[in-house]
Amino acid sequence: MGRMFGTDGVRGVANKELTADLAYKLGKAGAFILTEGTHRPKILVGMDTRISGDMLESALVAGILSVGAEAICVGVIPTPAIAYLTRKYNADAGVVISASHNPVEYNGIKFFNKNGYKLSDELEDSIQALIRDDFKDVPVLTGENIGRKIEEDGEAIRDYIDFAKSTIKGDLKGLKVTLDCANGASYITSVEAFKELGAEVHVINNKPDGININRNSGSTHPEDLMEYVVKNNCHMGLAFDGDADRCLAIDEKGNLINGDFILAICGKELKRQGRLKKNTIVVTVMSNLGLDIAMKKEEINTIKTKVGDRYVLEEMLKNDYAIGGEQSGHIIFSDYNTTGDGLVTALQLAHIVKESGKTFSELCSIMKELPQVLVNAKVPNDQKDIYLKDEEIKSEIDTITKNLDGSGRVLIRPSGTEPLVRVMLEGENQKEIDKLAHGLAKLIENKVK
């Protein structure tokens, strides 16, 4: 059995890879490992709008109840809401059934510990080991020792909306905004929060039918939102993904504003308020070099981690940083939540736009994005480290880096899932870096033939 857990829980095609049987086992093992020693543990369960959610929830909950835990089912709700509410309700753990931005046929199961954090690799390995060993030493409970399922009546959504609203001071009156809910988990929470704060709210893709989640919508397909914002003279647009743990934005001119710009704008504002701890933001190695340059001008440090919001969070927790995130729109505000939170990000950004008295595009001028080229080099899995060993490749990387002279960079990343090495170049001249990236990728491929 290979490693079951990926970077964001267990994911696969529902009913084929992520079966009801596997969901039952994950519920049983997760509840047992995360609540060991607790008298009558309670586990919060939420999901996105996928048609397979009901099937997987039934199986997952059966597993949870079989080891004596209570399952509090809150229905369709954003992933970050489960992280927040697990803490607020003093639950022993939280589980979300979602495959985030993936197409409808996929689904996933992701656990949070009692403090609202994603699980460590060690805990995930313990859950997998219990399943692999066929629940050896897990007692079979009967009678009154079996757990109960508790259907929650909407209070959870209300509590999450109130929490998200409390993260900004004042209101959003006078702001005209369009929200793209990706027909996903934010179709109630984000709309209500913005309306209650006084914004003029337009909404698209907020009619989930179980199969239209992420379909030509949300943060992975913002084209309709870009058009809508311009056509309706909105101050800004905000796009969520299926489980609303990320948010991308659109300025009033219809330009897509990614996570790098959001981090730059929010980082600068936190510094102005004296809340940017150690004057530092945390980003990944894939963030644009333009962000580094912009932050340097603002006297803000950038710390870089491996790709993945879990690594960003790890760095933030280690050094008590206030904000971090990824280009994809996973932004973590550690003062507010323990994971990427699309609604909290959207509200922070909207509030800054309103209070600044500037247009959104003017605020985005803080940063100039450098052209970026990504080329895949086909490399066998056992030779993915060739770029670290081969002298000619190393020499070529050094030459390119030297010629870019601080206004560009070379980044090489082996794929974690495919026989590929990704060659990424940034620089001021698109044509030049395109040529250099393809040349370097070809050199790497030729070396493994």
Swiss-Prot record:
Cofactor annotation: Mg(2+)
Positions carrying Phosphoserine: S100
Keyword Isomerase in annotation: yes
UniProt entry keywords in alphabetical sequence: Isomerase, Magnesium, Metal-binding, Phosphoprotein
Catalysed transformations (reactions): alpha-D-glucosamine 1-phosphate = D-glucosamine 6-phosphate
Cited Pfam families: PGM_PMM_I, PGM_PMM_II, PGM_PMM_III, PGM_PMM_IV
Binding site for Mg(2+): S100, D241, D243, D245
EC id: 5.4.2.10
Cofactor binding note of this UniProt entry: Binds 1 Mg(2+) ion per subunit.
One GO term describing the cellular component: cytosol
SUPFAM superfamilies referenced in this protein's UniProt entry, alphabetically: Phosphoglucomutase, C-terminal domain, Phosphoglucomutase, first 3 domains
Residues annotated as catalytic: S100
Top EC class, one word: isomerase
The record's account of how the chain is modified after translation: Activated by phosphorylation.
An example Gene Ontology biological process: carbohydrate metabolic process
GO molecular function per UniProt: magnesium ion binding; phosphoglucosamine mutase activity; phosphomannomutase activity
InterPro entries (alphabetical): A-D-PHexomutase_a/b/a-I, A-D-PHexomutase_a/b/a-I/II/III, A-D-PHexomutase_a/b/a-II, A-D-PHexomutase_a/b/a-III, A-D-PHexomutase_C, A-D-PHexomutase_C_sf, A-D-PHexomutase_CS, Alpha-D-phosphohexomutase_SF
Biological role stated in the UniProt entry: Catalyzes the conversion of glucosamine-6-phosphate to glucosamine-1-phosphate.
HAMAP family, alphabetized: GlmM_B
Similarity remark: Belongs to the phosphohexose mutase family.
Protein name: Phosphoglucosamine mutase
Organism: Clostridium botulinum (strain Okra / Type B1)
Recorded name of the encoding gene: glmM
